[in-house]
Curated annotation (Swiss-Prot):
It comes from Prochlorococcus marinus subsp. pastoris (strain CCMP1986 / NIES-2087 / MED4). The keyword Cell membrane applies. Belongs to the PlsY family. GO terms for molecular function: acyl-phosphate glycerol-3-phosphate acyltransferase activity. This is Glycerol-3-phosphate acyltransferase. The gene is plsY.
Length: 198
């Protein structure tokens, strides 16, 4: 059962939401457009606001549902974390798109809302505050990722816990997936959200 749920979590995470929206609405391959990501920000940049909103919600749902399925069948924290990792792995490295997917932000958010709603919504709050001030999605995502392990530590009070471990892994993964954005940020070349679709 555990292996089955992990497999389901991966395939759930690998559903190419953004790619499908790009193909059906604009006949474009998001992997070859903009940042090359299939996540909501690249959908916003190349497809539109409402498609990006729906992609974001669905991608959040992928991480949330994967963990909720695991929680339904077990109360083991480690297994919940493994299901979340599987969903995130599917989102970043989807089998359907030859391993080229998103950047783990929305699916990771869904996972943490399921693991600890306080941490999930606190991270979302940090993202929205930075976005309101900077108007830069990548900077907001990176900032939320940096704070994530600290928020988790404050919540559970231990570094020797699967939740803290996954918060650290996801933090590093999100920052690594944004490495090209970081280079553009340092050069002052990163697009602001109000520059998108102009």
């Amino acid at each position: 059962m555990h292996i089955l749920i992990i497999s389901i979590s991966y395939f759930l995470g690998s559903l190419p939401t953004g790619f499908l929206f790009g193909k059906f609405l604009k006949n474009i391959d998001l992997r070859l457009t903009g940042s090359g990501s299939t996540g909501a920000t690249n959908v916003l940049r190349n497809v539109g606001k409402w498609p990006a909103f729906f992609v974001f919600i669905i991608d959040v749902g992928k991480g949330l549902i994967a963990v909720k399925i695991a929680q339904h069948y077990t109360n083991q924290n480690l297994f919940e974390v493994l299901a979340g990792i599987a969903a995130i792995s599917g989102h970043i490295w989807p089998i359907w798109l030859k391993g080229k997917g998103g950047k783990a932000v929305a699916t990771g958010l869904g996972m943490f809302i399921a693991l600890s709603w306080k941490i999930g919504f606190a991270s979302l709050g940090i993202f929205l505050i930075i976005l309101a001030k900077s108007k830069i999605v990548s900077l907001s995502s990176i900032s939320a990722a940096i704070f994530l392990p600290f928020l988790m530590f404050l919540d559970i009070g231990s570094t020797n816990h699967p939740y803290f471990f996954i918060s650290l892994v996801v933090s590093i993964l999100v920052i690594w997936k944004h490495r090209t954005n970081i280079r553009r940020l340092l050069k002052g070349e990163e697009l602001k959200i109000n520059d998108i679709n102009k």
